[in-house]
Design a protein with these regions (language model features):
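N- or domain-start disorder-to-order transition segments that initiate the globular core
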Residues: 1-27
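Catalytic core of Fe(II)/2-oxoglutarate
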Residues: 2, 143-148, 158-292
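Non-heme Fe(II)/2-oxoglutarate
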Residues: 18, 22, 27-107
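Active-site rim elements
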Residues: 39, 85-93, 137-142, 175-179, ...
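Non-heme Fe(II) oxygenase catalytic core, chiefly the N-lobe of the double-stranded beta-helix
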Residues: 55-58, 82, 91-148
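Proline-centered turn/helix-capping motifs that create local helix->coil transitions or kinks
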Residues: 61-63, 110-113, 158-162
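A structural signal for the main folded, soluble domain(s) of proteins
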Residues: 72-77, 106-115, 119, 124-131, ...
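Eukaryotic charged/polar low-complexity linker/IDR segments
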Residues: 151-153
Length: 292
């Protein structure tokens, strides 16, 4: 990539007026989205901005946190020390006032709060054979206690073919039907409302060639008010069974074969994390830090 293109990426800022016009033009489509409010926006960013991010995207390795269980096999990182300048700059732009105003206008959800810590978000990467079973997301920010309201996903996969799989599936509230399948195409932005029943994932193993990965940026937004549909109570990720599918038990999740790349202690913690509200996990972490 030329130095001019990289400089452009590192100086990129959202155009407030363009974003607000985009939000106005898509608000009705967003709210009408089924099985829950969502929108797919292609060609969302200048291509040179995402090209710069893609060029510096970290390869799989020890710097990533590996989720490796029958429920999910993926890599994630919120550590900006392994990110390049263009990536860090773009992440900060997604937390900026113009982008927050865009999300509020698009979705009708007021007083959204971004997450500078990128808890659960940041960079995601899935290798061949990886997957993420259908689920509803954790509903409370582990540090602030704010209610989770929105997901925004930016895909970074050039020349992605349908046969590679990896489509984001949106499932009905009763888990009988996948009502939307969204391929993770380069420069595609997906925004959707998160509730206790906004079930989504890509449950089938990824079938891309060796050396390729499914790359994305994941961004989550919060508010002080719970969504009207909230069932009450904090929860972590709520995995769901598709028709004819049986999900593993906690015992199976913590068995040695359930996470061959992690020691037993890490497997146990991962299994407990699935059933423990994130705000409780964070409280325990802080208590341990004070005692250290």
């Amino acid at each position: 990539m030329s130095s001019i293109a990289r400089t452009t990426a590192e100086r990129f800022h959202f155009d407030r007026e363009r974003l607000l016009a985009l939000a106005e033009g898509n608000h009705a489509s967003y709210t009408a989205g089924r099985p829950f409010p969502h929108i797919v926006l292609d060609d969302f960013l200048p291509e040179e901005v995402l090209d710069a991010v893609l060029e510096e995207f970290p390869r799989p390795g020890a710097d990533w946190f590996a989720f490796d269980s029958p429920l999910e096999r993926k890599l994630a990182s919120k550590d900006d020390s392994i990110m390049g300048e263009a990536t860090r700059h773009l992440l900060y732009e997604f937390n900026s006032a113009p982008f927050i105003d865009f999300l509020e206008r698009l979705t009708g959800i007021d007083a959204l709060v971004p997450d500078p810590h990128f808890e659960g978000g940041g960079l995601h990467q899935i290798e061949p054979g990886g997957h993420l079973k259908v689920h509803a997301d954790f509903n409370r920010h582990p540090r602030t206690g704010l209610a989770r309201r929105l997901n925004a996903l930016i895909y970074l996969n050039r020349d992605w073919k349908p046969e590679y799989g990896g489509a984001l599936e949106l499932w009905s509230r009763d888990m009988t039907t996948s009502e939307a399948r969204i391929l993770p195409l380069f420069n595609r932005c997906v925004v959707f409302t998160t509730t206790d029943t906004s079930y989504h994932g890509h449950p089938e193993p990824l079938n891309c060639p060796q050396g390729e990965t499914r790359k994305s940026i994941a961004l989550y937004y919060y508010s002080k008010d719970d969504p009207a549909e909230a069932a009450g109570g904090d929860h972590n990720t709520l995995f769901q069974s598709r028709p004819g599918e049986a999900l593993p038990s906690i015992e199976e999740l913590t068995a040695p074969e359930a996470g061959t790349r992690r020691p037993a202690g890490e497997r146990l913690k991962a299994g407990l994390r699935l059933v423990t509200p994130p705000i409780v996990v964070e409280a325990v972490r802080r208590w341990r830090a004070r005692r250290a």
